[in-house]
């Protein structure tokens, strides 16, 4: 198989992977608010974090030990897609009578099987690139860019396309149909990807930890790896905050006569998509920054970028202050990529091959699992206090609190983490 061909196949995989997520991740909050679930938005995003505590690690172990990673990717996407379609169908058929319990249950099943696919897709890509004789640090970021392209295109699709009722998909259940269909396409496509062989069975008797792949947790014995994972969790608390509330926040300006006709207030998803455009460009900077500055400085840049991400949201509006929203979207690319992508590459470079899928799952557990769960729970408390339960809602106060949190995490990381040397083969 030619190097050009494998790159194209991995591009398609990444495109579909993130297109399925982009169809609803930033706009789901708007739909939930429209059906009366506004105060529970945090729970949906916390659930993403909760299932990421165990599902990525579990599926990573399965991929390392028993089932090739590309088949695990297919299985998970298939279940996720069917459950997401069921959630959309339930919302459509229930209309104004939609109940929280059934919809939340279907969403939970879908996200429980979707979240592991992010780390598994990375493992599939790294394995294929290494087989082709390529350096993942250099070759993966340009491929991963197309995942963000897919995310952007589905964001724009649900923003501009309207249903038979004349309402944009971003405000209705139609966004879940879009996501489910794309997941099923990837379910089929993943079966055509290069084989990722499981770890050969070791001779002799294995311990339970070795047999199940839990030995990835031995990384916590390394002080610097332990610090890295702890701060991955702390920074992971920031990841889903804007995904959960940015669309709802910007759309809320329509209730203010001064901004009711502002383009941004009426096209929140399109405005937010500038964040993903920035992400696309920033991915290309990662190889240079990782080689030049190392993981510590790259993650520090990400942490302080989150400060500006939240701060600009707090100060902006869709009218004369829309430029602050644009700046927030620009720094998002740095905030997200310099943490998520660089962290994943760091784990890949500094772990043994036999536990890499498990280690990627562990990274997901700390960031999108524990971090996102705690972060979205805390963010929900803040937003409910200052917005939904307040006599005079103050979104700005909530955003400034999030910015202050990111600043404190960045300062502590600068003090406690030392950039380790790259693992020698």
Q: What would you call each of these model-derived segments?
A:
Residues 1-53, 224-260, 267-271, 340:
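Helix-loop boundary and gating motifs at the non-cytosolic
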Residues 1-4, 194-229, 255-260:
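Juxtamembrane intracellular "pre-TM" segments in multi-pass secondary transporters
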Residues 9, 58, 86-92, 182-195, ...:
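Multi-pass alpha-helical transporter architecture, strongest
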Residues 42-64, 270-286:
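Central cavity-lining transmembrane alpha-helices of secondary-active solute carriers
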Residues 64-79, 291-303:
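Cytoplasmic membrane-interface "Motif A"-like loop-to-helix N-cap segments
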Residues 78-97, 304-319:
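C-terminal ends and interior cores of transmembrane alpha-helices
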Residues 108-146:
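Cytoplasmic helix-loop-helix junction between adjacent transmembrane helices
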Residues 160-181, 381-406:
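A membrane-interface helix-boundary motif in multi-pass transporters
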